[in-house]
Amino acid sequence: KDTGSEVFAMGYPMADVMGSEVKFTDGKISSKSGIGGDVRVYQISVPIQPGNSGGPLFDMGGNVVGITSSGLNRDYFKSENVNYAIKASYLKNLMEACPEEIILEERVETQVSSATLTDRIKQYEGYVVLILTK
């Protein structure tokens, strides 16, 4: 994806406080690299919180283009909406390197142009799950 592309995330930020309903946030790809020029990640303006990490980052066509991962420390860097997502292409390589076989279905990018964004969110929220750990 290119810098300036519109993207959105879905997840369960701070589920213990904000509840267990899936949340939607949107923004843009601010840069095609992260801290120190790390090309494995996108810098995104999508607001993410603890609990969004590991959730999907979608393009406006409904394709998963990344997985939300982190943000700059707001107190230390005095920054807002400087967050990161691991690019989907690097996740595919990681999954293929796993010792257990993971079958990945190749697919062509889709365009869900006829569905409204609210309809797409309703469709995708069934695939975004909350995982709790002890």
What residue ranges belong to the model's regions?
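Flexible, gly/ser-rich surface segments that form the specificity/activation loops bordering the active-site cleft
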Residues: 1-40, 48-52, 68-79
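Terminal peptide-recognition signature
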Residues: 4, 9, 29, 44, ...
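Sec-exported extracytoplasmic/periplasmic mature domains
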Residues: 12, 34, 63, 96-100
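Small beta-barrel nucleic-acid-binding modules, principally OB-folds
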Residues: 39-44, 94
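N-terminal activation segment of mature serine protease catalytic domains
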Residues: 97, 101-134
